[in-house]
Curated annotation (Swiss-Prot):
Protein name: Zinc metalloproteinase-disintegrin 8
Organism annotation: Crotalus adamanteus (Eastern diamondback rattlesnake)
Domain Peptidase M12B: 198-396
Gene3D superfamilies given in the database record: Collagenase (Catalytic Domain), Disintegrin domain
Function text: Inhibits ADP-induced platelet aggregation (probably by binding integrin alpha-IIb/beta-3 (ITGA2B/ITGB3)) and degrades fibrinogen.
Propeptide cleavage-removed residue intervals: 21-191
GO molecular function, one term: metalloendopeptidase activity
Major localisation: secreted
Keywords noted in UniProt: Calcium, Cell adhesion impairing toxin, Disulfide bond, Glycoprotein, Hemostasis impairing toxin, Hydrolase, Metal-binding, Metalloprotease, Platelet aggregation inhibiting toxin, Protease, Secreted, Signal, Toxin, Zinc, Zymogen
Residue stretches spanning the membrane: none
Residues the entry annotates as binding Zn(2+): 334, 338, 344
Keyword Kinase: no
Further comment: The disintegrin domain belongs to the long disintegrin subfamily.
Tissue/organ expression: Expressed by the venom gland.
Length: 488
């Protein structure tokens, strides 16, 4: 059983509250000061891990008490995660660090169904949380009092550049492409219209400009990337996509592919490097270049649309424009969205927020939600183009998960029948969120051959025909949709 650590935060208001202060996120005009004070609920004398599996924080925001629930993100790293950097003479140095007891968490605010949180607890509390529709950031204050933290709204951070930023992917003409089809129009029964579980094993590369920008501090660069991917995993979870960091590379001795003012040329060169070099030494599904280059034409990122799983095109480049990790994570999620066949949003697309992830114009306050258009486009893409996205269906072995099984992390592990997330978030009637077991009378909880918690009747089509191949059909004995391999 997971022990819960209770942490009380006492809110103090100081004379300089509301004045301007320079933080890692930039110049902040209005903030509150809090002092985290741990009050442990672990039994007296019990061994306390360095970073607990679950924590709660109580504090006030705008004078109102909130309770922040955090759970360690046990999907952050893939099994054979590695880190690579280069000696001054260009020699490759690869290590396999132990990452089980890391300090990166996801969470939510109690009694706020739409809340989210992505927090690093490595050195104090650092990250962001969404409360009542507004994004707040928290980070330690670099004062003589090391316990002081600042809490502030994202909108109160002064913008470095108010110029409109754009995604580098060419704006598509929606009418010129295959129309987006609603889930109900994909010739799939209702129970199969849920997103299939897919997996992206991700490599993030920091270029040499990033290395020099952070004064050669590889630890700092690694922490930045951890924070970005921690947010990525949360963003893609509603699509049933597990994003796991399988590799981190820092070009410490110089650029290994051409990085120029042209985003197109930089993307092409990085794709060629991935195809000819990286794929030969590291198994992965997608690679993203995080660069310190300021591209021409206010380009924030560039990628190949529908390039996922392609040796050269399953790549993206993202500019490390700000020190705000949430902003950069949003940009990387945007480029990954294009890799997954998702177009820019039209004006009519909505996500319940001021901006959505696939907006063509970069918002100063990044979104963490995909629009209704994006969800439909992704579902259409993943169902109709399975033959070109097979890398996404390589489910990691349940025995290869880095950390011990953890009910409530959305990932089915050894000893579990299903995992639909925390009880407050579970929407699967076939799965008991408290135990990660099937509910009484259920045969299955998900899968292309799972119909209202029962195995679909034998012979039911579960995957459309591909070229000269027949439809794949259910066996009646499993929720999986086997590849029949029969010519028509």
């Amino acid at each position: 059983m997971i022990q819960v650590l209770l942490v009380t935060i006492c809110l103090a208001v100081f004379p300089y509250q509301g004045s301007s202060i320079i933080l890692e996120s930039g110049n902040v005009n209005d903030y509150e000061v809090v002092y985290p004070r741990k009050v442990t609920a672990l039994p007296k004398g019990a061994a306390q891990p360095k970073y607990e599996d679950a924590m709660q924080y109580e504090f006030k925001v705008n004078g109102e008490p909130v309770v922040l629930h955090l759970e360690k993100n046990k999907e952050l790293f893939s099994e054979d995660y590695s880190e690579t950097h280069y000696s001054p003479d260009g020699r490759e140095i690869t290590t396999y660090p132990l990452v089980e007891d890391h300090c990166y968490y996801h969470g939510r605010i109690e009694n706020d169904a739409d809340s989210t949180a992505s927090i690093s607890a490595c050195n104090g509390l650092k990250g962001h949380f969404k409360l009542q529709g507004e994004t707040y950031l928290i980070e330690p204050l670099k004062l003589s009092d090391s316990e002081a933290h600042a809490v502030y709204k994202y909108e109160n951070v002064e913008k470095e550049d108010e110029a409109s930023k754009m995604c580098g992917v060419t704006e598509t003409n929606w009418e010129s492409y295959e129309p987006i089809k609603k889930a109900s129009q994909l010739n799939l029964p209702p129970e199969q219209q849920r997103f299939p579980q897919t997996y992206i094993e991700l490599v993030v590369v920091a270029d040499h400009r990033m290395y020099t920008k952070y004064d050669g501090d590889k630890t700092e660069i690694s922490s930045i990337i951890y924070e970005i991917v921690n947010t990525l995993t949360q963003i893609f979870r509603p699509l049933h996509i597990r994003v796991a960091l399988i590799g981190l590379e820092i070009w410490s001795s110089g650029e290994l592919s051409k990085v120029t003012l042209s985003a197109d040329d930089t993307l092409e060169a990085f794709g060629e490097w991935r195809e000819t070099v990286l794929m030969n030494r590291k198994r992965h599904d997608n690679a993203q270049l995080l660069t310190g280059m300021i591209f021409n034409e206010t380009i924030e990122g560039r990628t190949y649309k529908s390039g996922m799983c392609n040796p050269k095109h399953s790549v993206g480049i993202v500019r490390d424009y700000r020190t705000r990790r949430h902003f950069v994570a949003n940009r990387m999620a945007h480029e990954l969205g294009h890799n997954l066949g998702i177009d820019h949003d039209r004006d009519s697309c909505t996500c319940g927020a001021n901006s959505c992830i696939m907006s063509a114009t970069v918002s100063n306050e990044p979104s963490s939600q995909f629009s209704d258009c994006s969800l439909n486009k992704y579902l259409n893409y993943i169902v109709r183009y399975q033959s070109t996205t097979r890398c996404l269906h390589n489910e990691p072995s349940e025995t290869d998960i880095v950390s011990p099984p953890f009910c409530g992390n959305y990932f089915k592990e050894v000893g579990e029948d299903c995992d639909c997330g925390p009880p407050a978030n579970c929407q699967n009637p076939c799965c008991d969120a408290a135990t990660c077991k099937l509910t009484t009378g259920s045969q299955c909880a998900e899968g292309l051959c799972c119909d209202q918690c029962k195995f679909t009747k034998k012979g039911t089509a579960c995957r459309p025909a591909r070229g000269d191949w027949n439809d794949d059909t259910c066996t009646g004995q499993s929720a999986d949709c086997p590849r029949n391999g029969l010519y028509g």
